[in-house]
A protein has these predicted regions:
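A structural signal for multi-pass alpha-helical bundles of membrane permease subunits
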Residues: 4-9, 13-280
Length: 280
């Protein structure tokens, strides 16, 4: 009887888990479905609601959407690539020093870095804005890139330092005996072994920068260097009155770079390419 009761409870528990997963999947898929449907409908079909399938899908809306935001997407990609590279490079170098060297005040400095993680980012916006003005980089791409690199250091240092500390110390001892410098060990040992965590941090930084709306709105007014998230709202307001399907298509097109970058990053994990770092 006990085994039978446990079996029933197990089946019941699995059923609840499956139902919850289905609900979560639907909650994730529904906004995407609504956006796709509206992006393919004519104005008359748009008024009828979301559930009716489009009789004549308006695929040319996607061409119009891309033409509207392509320059802004390029601006976003440039900012995201430079910021991501800066965050990964400088934070990994700092983490290497914290994980491989002992020096006076090391623990205090690392505790200070960790304390900065507790500070809400909104509290640093005003000081960052004043620094941008003092540096004379307001309304330039550097107003996006430099604060992005500085703001992304704290979490990245913590992540990299935790990972670097777990790397075999024997590799570094052998390299030191062979006369390898810190720079050599950093590029030839530490980074190749840390490719998975480097990719994780790069994807996170890229996504945060690409989706950022508030900070670019504060520091960039020049139309030629605005990011895609800045432009979406203004362009959507202009076209929504005439062809609302184009505005929905823009939302979908703007997400394509994030999807492609994520797929490229996941490729390393699926193919096991990160294991190549073990071949020293």
């Amino acid at each position: 009887m006990k085994n039978k009761r446990r079996g029933i409870q197990g089946v019941f528990g699995q059923a609840i888990v499956i139902i919850l997963l289905i609900i979560i999947i639907l909650l994730v898929i529904m906004p995407i479905y609504v956006t796709v449907m509206y992006s393919l409908k004519t104005n008359s079909e748009y008024i009828k609601g979301v559930w009716a399938l489009p009789k004549n899908p308006q695929w040319h809306y996607y061409t119009a959407a891309f033409l509207n935001i392509k320059s802004y997407m390029l601006n976003s990609l440039l900012v995201c690539v430079l910021t991501t590279a800066g965050v990964v490079l400088f934070s990994s170098m700092t983490a290497y020093v914290f994980s491989r060297h002992d020096f006076f005040g090391k623990n205090f400095l690392f505790a200070l870095v960790m304390a900065l993680m507790m500070v809400p980012s909104v509290l640093t916006m005003t000081p960052q804005f004043l620094i941008v003005l003092k540096l004379g980089i307001y309304d330039t791409r550097w107003a996006l890139i430099l604060p992005g690199i500085a703001g992304g250091q704290v979490g990245a240092i913590f992540l990299f330092r935790t990972f670097f500390s777990q790397q075999p110390s024997s590799l570094f001892e052998s390299a030191t005996l062979d006369g390898a410098s810190d720079l050599t060990m950093y590029f030839r040992i530490t980074l190749p072994l840390a490719i998975p965590v480097l990719i994780i941090q790069a994807l996170g930084t890229f996504g945060l920068m690409y989706n950022d709306f508030l900070w670019p709105t504060l520091v960039v007014k020049d139309e030629s260097i605005k990011t895609v998230m800045q432009s979406l709202k203004n362009i959507a307001e202009k076209v929504n009155g005439t062809t609302p399907g184009v505005s929905y298509a823009m939302y979908l097109v703007s997400g394509v770079p994030l999807i492609l970058v994520s797929l490229c990053g996941l490729k390393f994990f699926v193919n096991g390419d990160f294991a190549s770092g073990m071949k020293l």
